[in-house]
Amino acid sequence: MEEKRKKIRVLVGGVFDILHVGHIHFLKQAKELGDELVVIVAHDETVRMQKRREPINPAEDRAELLRAIRYVDEVYIGTPGTIDMELVKRIDPDVIAIGPDQFFNCEKLKEELRKHGINAEVIRIPYLYKSDRAKTSKIIQRIVETFCE
């Protein structure tokens, strides 16, 4: 009888506001690290704190869009503030993939995960697609320049 291998769960987090091709490339690369891709979407309050702006789309809409992407298996909305380690623990990832433009110190994150009993590998995804078309802030800037001036 063939023994079933454990599925490798990959976790990513992000704002994912104004979904663009850079997000798709990131999600695809993250999915390639395992069998299941779980996404934690930043809570609206977290967006306000980190980006110092209102989210363009509410978290529920961003989550729904992500659920429609073929690389994504599960989506959760995070809690306001910092990383919800209890949610991460419940998800039980084998790998946490960090985006190329996310400002995380991978070593500090690993240390914080270990403190909470989470033994996941942390991998930074390199830029595969680097373009102004793949940055939400640049997209917003182009919209303003095109339609508001």
Curated annotation (Swiss-Prot):
Coiled coil: none
Keywords: ATP-binding, FAD, Flavoprotein, FMN, Nucleotide-binding, Nucleotidyltransferase, Transferase
Residues passing through the membrane, by range: none
Residues noted as binding ATP in the record, renumbered to the chain: V15, F16, H20, V21, G22, H23, D101
EC number from the UniProt entry: 2.7.7.2
Pathway: Cofactor biosynthesis; FAD biosynthesis; FAD from FMN: step 1/1
Record Pfam families: CTP_transf_like
Gene Ontology molecular functions: ATP binding; FMN adenylyltransferase activity
Gene Ontology biological process terms, A to Z: FAD biosynthetic process; FMN metabolic process
Signal peptide span: none
Catalytic activity: FMN + ATP + H(+) = FAD + diphosphate
Subunit record text: Homodimer.
UniProt xrefs under HAMAP family: FAD_synth_arch
Annotated function: Catalyzes the transfer of the AMP portion of ATP to flavin mononucleotide (FMN) to produce flavin adenine dinucleotide (FAD) coenzyme.
NCBIfam families per record: cyt_tran_rel
Designated name of the protein: FAD synthase
Organism: Thermococcus kodakarensis (strain ATCC BAA-918 / JCM 12380 / KOD1) (Pyrococcus kodakaraensis (strain KOD1))
